[in-house]
UniProtKB/Swiss-Prot annotation:
Protein species of origin: Staphylococcus haemolyticus (strain JCSC1435)
Gene that produces this protein: rex
SUPFAM superfamilies the record matches: NAD(P)-binding Rossmann-fold domains, Winged helix' DNA-binding domain
Protein name, as recorded: Redox-sensing transcriptional repressor Rex
Functional description taken from the UniProt entry: Modulates transcription in response to changes in cellular NADH/NAD(+) redox state.
Subunit structure and binding partners: Homodimer.
UniProt-annotated binding residues for NAD(+): G92, V93, G94, N95, L96, G97
DNA-binding region: 18-57
Any one of the GO BP annotations: response to redox state
SMART domains cross-referenced by the UniProt entry: CoA_binding
Keywords from the named record: Cytoplasm, DNA-binding, NAD, Repressor, Transcription, Transcription regulation
Cellular compartment(s): Cytoplasm
Entries under Gene3D superfamilies matching the protein: NAD(P)-binding Rossmann-like Domain (3.40.50.720), Winged helix-like DNA-binding domain superfamily/Winged helix DNA-binding domain (1.10.10.10)
Keyword Protein transport in annotation: no
Record's GO cellular component terms: cytoplasm
Length: 212
């Protein structure tokens, strides 16, 4: 199914994993079709928004029938590159880094953190959650050898930009940034910022102003 992702709103693209997870859940329950109303009620997203999101990708469903679960799953796997095993590296094995290594996408069979990096000599050479921890000096060599192009960044804030520069030199294409720093990278590298403090403040704001 041909579509130009450059013309699709970022908000739509960010909702695709939510749809995928929900449809996967329906599949595991033996459900073979779903309509936008059911998706709306489960994910708290307006039906009109769901239909508009899906319309960017062509005819995913039929009026009066809804969406076939198997067809949706096949589409989402292709759109999200989830039909392939994706190897990910993590840089910064502090408390958050250790937690992510232990979790290691346990509900996503296709995504796995396979390599970790740090500068602490007491950590380097050990394994955490079955993931080997390498020294930062070996970053580019290991990433290139393992053909890894996605990295989770959990370093201290002051080290984030320096490490980001190293990741760019290693031809990384995507960075999930858990540090408070707003790192600068070329347009060829996608960065998603996850600031837990901001997310919590946002939650508290909505609780205060929008709760019944």
């Amino acid at each position: 199914m041909a579509h130009n992702k450059s013309k699709i709103p970022r908000a739509t693209l960010k909702r695709l994993p939510l749809y995928y997870r929900f449809v996967n859940t329906l599949k595991s329950k033996g459900i073979d079709r779903v309509n936008s109303k059911a998706i709306s009620e489960a994910l708290n997203i307006e039906s009109a928004t769901i239909r508009r999101d899906f319309s960017y990708f062509g005819e995913l469903g039929k009026k009066g029938y809804g969406y076939n679960i198997d067809s949706l799953l096949e589409f989402f796997k292709t759109a999200l590159s989830d039909s392939d095993n994706i190897h990910i590296a993590l840089v910064g094995v502090g408390n958050l880094g250790r937690a992510l290594l232990t979790y290691n996408f346990s509900i996503h069979d296709e995504m796995t953190i396979t390599e970790a990096f740090d500068i602490d000599e007491q950590i380097v050479g050990t394994e955490i959650g079955d993931v080997s921890v390498h020294h930062m000096n070996d970053l580019k060599k290991v990433l290139n050898a393992q053909n890894i192009n996605v990295v989770i960044l959990t370093t201290p804030e002051e080290a984030a930009q320096r490490v980001a520069n190293q990741l760019v030199e290693a031809d990384i294409q995507g960075i999930l940034n858990f540090t408070p720093a707003r790192i600068e990278v070329p347009n060829t590298v996608q960065v998603h910022h996850i600031d837990l403090g901001i997310e919590l403040q946002s939650l508290l704001f909505f609780m205060k102003n929008y709760s019944n």
